């Protein structure tokens, strides 16, 4: 038997992916399902959720779709109950739900916008983890992969609120990793830079996207599947000695 671990251990596991109906979340849900993980795809748009679930089940994977607002504790509690009843206890939690980093100048950013972004990107991560963490502690096993952004560490084309929220996710994840390692729970974080998705295509032209991609050492934008590949590694036993880290996915831009 090879001493190099693969992703075979993902087969038979149960994962919850919030923000799972589109972009990075959808790509991650599909990647997990392709390796035999049963996935709960969570989002707010029923049609988008059903499309992602369908793309999984059409290929023989196991997935269910759930509508939930991850800033509402009662909806997350219902999600936990429903997921447990339909798929079983959660082994892998990926709280990817959040807003976007649309550019907002700090001198025009309002308190209302600040609170909304912190709620959608940081508080939602905390509440989602809080809903599922007791189950993992009781089983002394679990993997949590959170979603930050390159904006947490770099001056970026986003907003101060978004940068602060995503930096908060990094700190929260590191704290969780330290606090719950003794319970057999690993916590790591992903920090992607510019990933081409529907949102980006809606507010940037093809030429603008090409110019942005050319600014990266690897001369292209990230794709949702690039981030999903890293999420898959962190979810599997291939990363069994990895916890408390933030993985930068930035096409080499962290070197600049």
Question: Which residues does each predicted region cover?
Answer:
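Short C-terminal tail/terminal secondary-structure segment
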Residues: 2-7, 103, 154, 232, ...
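Conserved glycine-rich cofactor-binding loop
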Residues: 14, 21-23
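Substrate-binding pocket helix/loop in short-chain dehydrogenase/reductase
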Residues: 104-106, 110-118, 200, 212
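Active-site loop immediately N-terminal to the catalytic Tyr-X3-Lys motif
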Residues: 107, 154-160, 182-183, 219, ...
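Catalytic Tyr-X3-Lys loop
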Residues: 110-126, 141, 145, 169, ...
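Active-site helix of classical SDR
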Residues: 129, 165, 173
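Alpha-helical segment proximal to the catalytic Tyr-Lys
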Residues: 134, 178-182, 240
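Residue(s) in the substrate-gating loop at a strand-loop-helix junction
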Residues: 149
């Amino acid at each position: 038997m090879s001493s190099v671990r693969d992703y075979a251990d993902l087969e038979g596991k149960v994962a919850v992916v919030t923000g799972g109906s589109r972009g990075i979340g959808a790509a991650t849900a599909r990647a997990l399902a392709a390796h035999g993980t049963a996935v709960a795809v969570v989002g707010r748009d029923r049609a988008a959720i059903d499309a992602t679930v369908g793309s999984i089940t059409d290929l023989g994977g196991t997935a269910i779709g759930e509508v939930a607002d991850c800033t509402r504790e009662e909806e997350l509690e219902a999600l936990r109950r429903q997921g447990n009843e339909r798929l079983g206890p959660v082994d892998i939690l990926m709280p990817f739900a959040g807003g976007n980093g649309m550019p907002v100048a700090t001198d025009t950013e309002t308190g209302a916008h600040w609170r909304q972004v912190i709620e959608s990107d940081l508080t939602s991560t905390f509440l989602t983890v809080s809903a599922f963490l007791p189950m993992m502690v009781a089983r002394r096993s679990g993997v949590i992969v959170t979603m930050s952004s390159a904006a947490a560490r770099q001056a970026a084309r986003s907003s101060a609120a978004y940068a602060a929220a995503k930096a908060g996710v990094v700190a929260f994840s590191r704290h969780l990793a330290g606090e719950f390692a003794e319970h057999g729970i690993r916590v790591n974080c992903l920090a992607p830079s510019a990933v081409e998705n529907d949102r980006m295509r809606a507010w940037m032209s093809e030429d603008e996207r090409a110019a942005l991609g050319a600014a990266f050492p690897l001369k292209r934008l990230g794709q949702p599947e690039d981030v999903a590949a890293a999420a898959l590694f962190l979810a599997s036993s291939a990363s069994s000695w990895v916890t408390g880290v933030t993985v930068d996915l930035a096409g080499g831009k962290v070197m600049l």
